[in-house]
Amino acid sequence: MLKRNLVNYVKNKDLIEKKIGPFHIIIKDQIEGEVDIEASFGSVIRTLPGHFLTLIDVVYIGQFSFLEEKEVNALYVDGSLFITNVQDNDDDLIDDIIHEIAHAVED
């Protein structure tokens, strides 16, 4: 249900799409904070084994009500990462990405 609602939202919104290494990234809302998306994802790519990265189909960055409701910055759901656009710096974003990829590995 969550994915279906997001897909409908994504179809009706102006988005920025990026491909960084194996990651397909959809930016729903601009990132707030001193963050270099390319550098952050590049660091993750250099840090984690490649087979971990293939567990992620898409990364959504933005404001999501379900993140706020759960009081979390990021969430892994069915091959997708949902990450808040409110990030302090590169390390904050990297931490969120790696933490959620760890959940993908657990599954």
Please provide the spans of the model-predicted regions.
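Residue-level signal for functionally critical sites in structured catalytic/ligand-binding pockets
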Residues: 6-7, 15-18, 106
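Auxiliary, metal-adjacent structural segments of Zn-dependent hydrolase domains
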Residues: 13, 17-79, 86-90
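Intrinsically disordered, low-complexity segments enriched in glycine/proline and serine/threonine
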Residues: 6, 83, 88, 103-104
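Active-site recognition of the HExxH zinc-binding catalytic motif
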Residues: 95-107
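N-terminal leader/presequence regions that precede the main folded/catalytic core
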Residues: 2-9, 21
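Proteins with a high burden of low-complexity, intrinsically disordered sequence enriched in S/T/G/P/A and R
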Residues: 1-2, 70, 107
